[in-house]
Swiss-Prot record:
A GO cellular-component term linked to this record: extracellular space
Keyword Chaperone among UniProt keywords: no
Gene: CAP18
Keywords (A to Z) from UniProt: Antibiotic, Antimicrobial, Disulfide bond, Secreted, Signal
Name assigned to this protein: Antimicrobial protein CAP18
Disulfide bonds: 85-96, 107-124
Gene3D superfamilies reported in the protein's UniProt record: 3.10.450.10
Free-text tissue specificity from the UniProt record: Neutrophils.
SUPFAM superfamilies given in the database record: Cystatin/monellin
Entry function: CAP18 binds to the lipid A moiety of bacterial lipopolysaccharides (LPS), a glycolipid present in the outer membrane of all Gram-negative bacteria. Has antibiotic activity.
PANTHER family: CATHELICIDIN, CATHELICIDIN ANTIMICROBIAL PEPTIDE
Subcellular location(s) per record: Secreted
């Protein structure tokens, strides 16, 4: 009878331990995807930044090393843009709208995809403004402007010539 009495108690404890084991996060850290590693680097940039507003990921370059080990530093490059949210907000950058004329920064560095290490070496600098048009675009723009001026002059000459073609009424 004693064994029968302890039977349900042992089953209950076993079930409880099983449920607790399922609810607990795994002790082994999982590897981050490339995108997750970049997003964590953006978070680290926001935490270390002295800027007034948060920055949000605008774009990221494709992963350069496909088969790299997760604990090996991998090169990353991405672009962030200033949001409307102040740095002191509790919002995630993904919840913030981009600032209309917000600063854009180009970031390069290395990250590890091994979640337990959280290793980032990122440098972000203000992105270059749109470069002045050079080469073919610049020549096409000049050509277009010359054509506009020539057409304007031709239009003025035609307007001056048309009144001379009208029949004279003073006989």
């Amino acid at each position: 009878m004693e064994t029968h009495k302890h039977g349900p108690s042992l089953a209950w404890w076993s079930l409880l331990l099983l449920l607790l084991g399922l609810l607990m996060p795994p002790a082994i850290a999982q590897d981050l995807t490339y995108r997750e590693a970049v997003l964590r680097a953006v978070d680290a940039f926001n935490q270390q930044s002295s800027e007034a507003n948060l920055y949000r990921l605008l774009s990221m370059d494709p992963q350069q090393l496909e088969d790299a080990k997760p604990y090996t530093p991998q090169p990353v490059s991405f672009t962030v843009k200033e949001t409307e949210c102040p740095r002191t907000t509790w919002k995630l950058p993904e919840q913030c709208d981009f600032k209309e004329d917000g600063l854009v920064k180009r970031c390069v560095g290395t990250v590890t995809r091994y979640q337990a290490w959280d290793s980032f070496d990122i440098r972000c600098n203000r992105a270059q403004e749109s470069p002045e048009p050079t080469g073919l675009r610049k020549r096409l723009r000049k050509f277009r402007n010359k054509i506009k001026e020539k057409l304007k002059k031709i239009g003025q000459k035609i307007q001056g010539f048309v009144p001379k073609l009208a029949p004279r009424t003073d006989y």
